[in-house]
Design a protein with these regions (language model features):
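Short carbohydrate-recognition loop motifs
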Residues: 1-10
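Solvent-exposed strand-to-loop "edge" motifs in beta-rich extracellular domains
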Residues: 28-34, 57-59, 132
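Short consensus segments that form the blades of beta-propeller domains
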Residues: 41-45, 160
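A short beta-strand element within beta-rich, extracytoplasmic domains
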Residues: 22-32, 147-153
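Extracellular beta-strand elements of beta-rich domains used
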Residues: 149, 168-171
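Extracellular/lumenal carbohydrate-interaction signature centered on repeated Trp-anchored short motifs
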Residues: 14-25, 118-121
Length: 182
């Protein structure tokens, strides 16, 4: 269970995984309700009752000189765990599923709406995504190694109160045989 009351809560699991060899990400979650004032396109609305992040470590040769400088500065301030890129699978309040937009704080993270609105709130929902294909769609190139997976429930921008539950999260080599809800 994750709660946010004008705050944010998250949990990170560091990994070192080849995204092309282990491309399938499966998870389940349930929210009481989405963040009413959430807006995937604005910093003031960058809050979600549920999100699952996949972070990536981009080899230095794939970064521009400016990106390498920014990465060095970020790691000097925050340590080596600062990811180079990320995909955030979110439950938005209004954008339709399938929407992919840059995070309002950084262009190195893409927000991918997998659920929207309140119609399915209060129910456990399961998802399976091909993170390699999603990375290509979001960034236009093959994915680098996965450096971590995280969950986050946050309302620090909107000041709302939400609650979410997260089930198992797994990476696999091939799609599951079960029929997912999304």
């Amino acid at each position: 269970e994750a709660n946010a009351d004008a705050s944010a809560s998250g949990l990170v699991r560091k990994l070192d995984v080849d995204a092309k060899a282990w491309p399938m990400l499966a998870w389940s979650w349930k929210v009481e309700r989405p963040v009413a004032k959430g807006d995937v396109t604005r910093r003031s609305g960058d809050d979600y009752a549920a999100r699952v992040y996949v972070t990536f470590r981009v080899p230095p040769e794939r970064l521009s000189p400016f990106e390498r400088m920014t990465r060095s500065a970020a790691r000097a301030m925050f340590g080596d765990d600062v990811p180079d890129a990320g995909l955030a699978y979110i439950w938005d309040s209004r954008a339709p599923p399938g929407t992919i937009v840059p995070n309002p704080y950084t262009d190195r993270v893409r927000m991918i709406v997998v659920e929207s609105g309140s119609a399915r709130a209060g129910r456990w929902l399961s998802y399976e995504r091909d993170i390699a294909a999603d990375y290509r769609a979001a960034f236009g190139e093959d994915p680098p190694p996965v450096s971590g997976v995280a969950i986050m429930t946050d309302t620090d921008n909107t000041g709302e109160r939400v609650r979410a539950w997260y089930g198992d999260i797994a990476l696999s080599r091939a799609p599951s045989v079960r029929k997912d809800s999304a």
